[in-house]
Amino acid sequence: SDNPNIDEDEPEVLYTALTHSREPLGMMNLIYFVQLLAEEQNSNTELEYLISNREMWFIPIVNPDGYAYNELIEPNGGGMHRKNRLNTNCGNGSNRGVDLNRNYGFGWGSNDTGSSPNPCSATYRGDTEFSEPETQAVRDFIINHEFKNVLHYHCYSNVYIHPWGNGSFPEEPDSSTLVDIGREMARYNGYPVGTGLSTIGYTVNGDAVDWTYGDQSIISYVPEVGSTSQGFWPPESDVLELCLDQVHSNKIFAFVAGSDIIIHSYELSHEDMVPGETVELDVVIQNRGLSDSDAYIDININTLNEF
């Protein structure tokens, strides 16, 4: 926002990362994007527009205790602790804790495939839904705002995942809306778009995306950033490129929080014209955003031939 201390009547969008504490690239990507917004807002018209017309919120670390533990055991990176640090009577290592992305209240504990009742499992869902302070904090933050869409970053697999966690698709028109947004996010990096089952081959329950969409009716996505070979802790030399890969998707996700008017398609009655001849032009305008548009639309048509 260009007025961060004022609650303006602008579309709101939220980005989160590091729900799983061994997935730091989500955080790095968000910090890079925030830096880009701050440093290039006066030289980049898209960024300037977003700052002036959106309220963008960032939670770069959802799981600070888990991340601090990874820093403790592997100061140079590479710690593989995934969950938070709740004492679940599984020792002091990486088996303890609750998987925060199985602790949300929508579909929590619906089966033992998408999450686990075993306190020492990597996908342990907790004793009850929203049992953990981290998920409570994210829940309350979302409820206290009017977000149009939320992006929950994870690693890895180079895919964009939308609801539902059980592999089924939302009803229309939301299903098409989600796919259209995901495909535009993937325009330049080519990430596959779909459910977790269709993209990475497994189901989840009690996850943040299903709660955000299913309980709060907010369009939500999980970007899984980084390739299988790069893993949870990609080489330092790969980090900048991976952050750059998400700039377009981060911008698009902010654009679609409001009205986002584009030329969807156009058709000429015929393309070859002799001097003085007229043609008919049919233009289809689409609002691919999540908010209504009350603006006038101007279309300027210019010739590419100076003669």
Where on the chain are the PLM-derived regions?
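Metallocarboxypeptidase
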Residues: 71-72, 76-266
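Beta-strand secondary-structure signal
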Residues: 14, 222, 280-284, 296-298
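Short glycine/serine/proline-enriched coil/turn segments at secondary-structure junctions
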Residues: 4-7, 92, 111, 275, ...
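Short acidic, flexible loop segments centered on an aromatic residue
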Residues: 284-307
